[in-house]
Amino acid sequence: MPCIYFCSIYFLAMEFLYILQDGRMGYCGTRPSVDVIQAESRIVGGHDAELGAWPWQVSLQIYRVELGGFRHECGGSLINHNSVLTAAHCIKKWVNPEYWRAVIGLHHLYKQNAHTVNCRVRNIVIHSNFKTGSYENDIALFILLKTVKYNDYIQPICLPDISHLLADENTCYISGWGKKEAKGKFQKILQEAEVEIIPLYICNGHDWYKGSISRDMICAGSESGFHTLYMYLKNFYNTPQTKGF
């Protein structure tokens, strides 16, 4: 039986997108520096991602006065030259875009490299029907102050077609610098893991979410067991397709 996310490890503050080929987006969902998904990616609990493995991964960071600098708050996905899609619940009280920056092309959370680009944020758009209690419509868009140039380590993800449906047990990949424990520290190196879409009737069972997960949400996990259930509702996942992600 599957568990939600990894059972022994769960990632907080990570947001993901379906990696789907969408003709409306044009050139997207490609990983120039990585030829194929490595077979060893199927590791329960996740592991360090290869440099450039997820070139749309973004670290959304907020300036903390008490720290005297920026701190990673949550992940996002680059969807074009100046827009990052993330979860609305990450923003919390920090709705002023001047507090934020987007770090793109990042691998080590605390060490930027030659491929890294820092962008300040022009505007933050939160879904008008976002509900904090149920996580319905948990989507937000960060509009960047400058245009980002694509390279082998910075690429946009493809958005899913509105009519696309993910089948149960469809394989997806997740990535981020999330914490292993609720009060733990963020991971230094970008993490990745393989998960499967879990049927809603399992997630909505009496022992788990008791019907609180709607059909607009996605439940995903591993095959290692069902003894622990941790999930962020309406996260986004990376799903390989024929022509890209």
Named regions from a protein language model:
Residues 30, 37, 42, 60-63, ...:
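Conserved H-D interstitial segment of serine endopeptidase catalytic domains
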Residues 48-53, 78, 94-96, 132-135, ...:
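Extracellular/periplasmic catalytic domains that process cell-envelope and extracellular macromolecules
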Residues 84-88, 136-161, 189-190:
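Conserved active-site neighborhood of the chymotrypsin/trypsin-like protease fold
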Residues 48, 111-116, 133-136, 151, ...:
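Gly/Ser-enriched beta-turn/beta-hairpin loop segments
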Residues 34-43, 57-68, 161, 170-245:
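Extracellular trypsin-like serine protease catalytic domains
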Residues 113, 126-131, 147-187:
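Active-site substrate-binding loop(s) of clan PA
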Residues 1-85, 106, 233-236, 240-245:
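Protease-domain processing segments flanking chymotrypsin-fold serine proteases, especially trypsin-like
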